[in-house]
Structure formats: C-alpha cells, structure tokens
UniProtKB/Swiss-Prot annotation:
HAMAP family: UPF0761. The keyword Transmembrane helix applies. The chain crosses the membrane at residues 46-66, 103-123, 138-158, 184-204, 214-234, 248-268. It is a multi-pass membrane protein. This is UPF0761 membrane protein Patl_3954. Belongs to the UPF0761 family. It is found in: Cell inner membrane. Pfam families: Virul_fac_BrkB (PF03631). NCBIfam families: PRK01637.1 (NF002457), yihY_not_rbn (TIGR00765). The keyword Cell membrane applies. Coiled coil: none annotated. Keywords: Cell inner membrane, Cell membrane, Membrane, Transmembrane, Transmembrane helix.
Length: 300
C-alpha cells in the first residue's frame, strides 16, 4: 500500500514537469523551423553528395589498410543509411564519382569546397538551434571542417573493421550462443549511429555541451533513425505507387524524401539535447530561488 502511495506521489510530481518539457520541446521545434531547415539541408546534401563521397573515398584510398574493406564501407553507407534502392543509388553514385575523378585539379578543388559548404550549413543550422551567439574564428572553423572531412572517413573505416572483427567473433561463437551473429548485426549499426549522433552534438555546437544530455539526444536520434528506416522501407515495399508515377526516375524522389527525413531526425535529436539543457537549467534556478525564499537567514 505504501509503495502505491509513493509511486502516486512520484507521478504527481513528475507529470507537470513532463508536460512542461514536452511543450518546451514542441515550441523549440516550431521556433527553429526544423522542417524548413531539414528541407534546406536535404537540398544542399543532394548537391554535395557526389563531391562529399568522392572526397570521402579519396581520403580512404590514401590508406592501404582500408582498401580491402571499401566494399564493406559502401555496403554500410548505402545499405544501412539508405533503405531500399540502395544498390541502384550506389550504382549511380559510383558512376558519378568515376566521372568526377577524371576532372583536373581545379575541378577537384571545387568539389572539396562544395563538400565543405555542406559541413558549413550543418554547423550553422545546429548552432542556430543551440542559439550560440559567439562565432568561432575563421581559422578555427576551417580547422574543424577539415577535421570532420578528413577524420570522418577514417573513423567510419575503423568502425567497419571493428564491426567485421565483432561479426567474425560472433560467427565463431554461434555454436555456443545461438543467434549471436544476428544480434551483433543488429546491435553494431545502432551503436555506430549513437556514436555518430553523439560526436555531432558534442563537437559542432559552439557551446559547452553536457555529455549526458548529448548522449540522451544521440540515443533518441539513433532510435528514431532506425524506426524511420523500418517505416520508410515498409512504405516503399508495400505501397509502390511512386514507381507507377515516376517509373525509372523513382529513385530520385525516394532519395530526396529519405534525406529529408534523415535531417529531421538529426535536428530532432539536436533539439532534444538543447531542450534538456534548458529545462534542467531553468529547474535548477527555480529550486535555488525556492530554497533562498525558504531560508529564514536569507537577506530580505
């Protein structure tokens, strides 16, 4: 009986706070116009897709250790991050990258600039969500962009190698633990998504971010990303009306819609991280004020 009373009191104390938190989250999403920002980033992403992937694999090709896992990296990118039509899109992108690689030094440099512009747009959008007033020095900003562009491919390559080792280990343990390989294949992409969201929310904002808040936002972003992939794949598979309308060109709207949904997920995770920080900051100020008012020795 006492436990029921305790849980009832806990619910009464937390329900109003949960209501305030949800309203704050919705208001922040509406204020920042994440649907409009996601559309802008989706458009820029599609324009930057070929330059970014070309720079990505050019950096990887400089390291012979990653040459053997290039196919696995492509499968990771197009299989896990683009549900359905991944093989078709992969073929188109590979052809575009092959054509772009025949360009001269000036053309390749322009592709690098386009890839950096994509990172710049992501940076500005996330900093607008966090309301970062101060701007970084240009040299520092360029250094961060370049670090993301160069270290990003290396981190993904290392994650693929580690995933291969984990899956191989799971295969060897399959005889002792049934379903180990299947579980590993499901867990590793999710953990990789959480790490990617966490790094994004920690590094990009020009503010000090609490790692715990960023981890919550990263976990929610990765969860929404996985659910979006399942839902999008289900819709594409069971309601193929887009193929009747667009025919052979159906892959283009599919890719655009998926990139748009992906950016909405990224921005929702960023908003959640920011709202958690604002909510706990306001709550701590309210608690401090309440304690100060209840203290009889506090100055009038």
């Amino acid at each position: 009986m006492e436990s029921k009373v305790i849980w009832s009191d806990v619910l009464r104390s937390w329900l109003p706070k949960a209501n305030i938190f949800v309203r704050m989250f919705v208001n922040h999403c509406q204020r920042d116009g994440i649907t409009v920002s996601a559309g802008h980033l989706a458009y820029v992403s599609l324009l930057s897709l070929v330059p970014f992937i070309m720079v990505f694999f050019t950096i990887l090709s400089a390291f012979p250790a990653f040459s053997e896992v290039r196919g696995d990296i492509e499968a990771l990118i197009f299989g896990n991050f683009i549900p359905t039509s991944g093989d078709q899109i992969q073929g188109y992108v590979a052809e575009f990258v092959g054509n772009a690689s025949k360009m001269g030094a000036i053309g390749i440099l322009s592709l690098v600039v386009v890839a950096l512009l994509l990172i710049s747009n992501i940076d500005k959008t996330l900093n607008r969500i966090w309301q970062a007033k101060s701007e970084r020095p240009i040299i520092f900003t360029f250094a961060i962009y370049w670090m993301i562009l160069t270290l990003g491919p290396l981190l993904i390559g290392l994650s693929v190698i580690m995933s291969s080792y984990l899956v191989a280990f799971a295969n060897s343990a399959e005889a002792y633990t049934m379903g180990a390989t299947t579980a590993m294949l499901k867990i590793v992409p999710f953990i990789a998504s959480v790490c990617a969201f966490f790094i994004l929310y920690m590094i990009v904002p020009n503010k000090r971010i609490n790692p715990r808040h960023a981890l919550v936002g990263a976990f929610m972003g990765a969860l929404l990303f996985e659910l979006s992939k399942k839902g999008f794949s289900f819709y594409i598979t069971h309601f193929p009306s887009y193929q009747m309308i667009y025919g052979a060109m159906a892959v283009i709207p599919i890719l655009f819609v998926w990139v748009y949904l992906s950016w909405i997920v990224v921005l929702l995770g960023a908003e959640l991280t920011h709202v958690i920080e604002v909510f706990f900051h306001e709550e701590s100020k309210e608690n401090f004020t309440q304690v100060d008012e209840d203290d009889p020795q506090s100055p009038a």
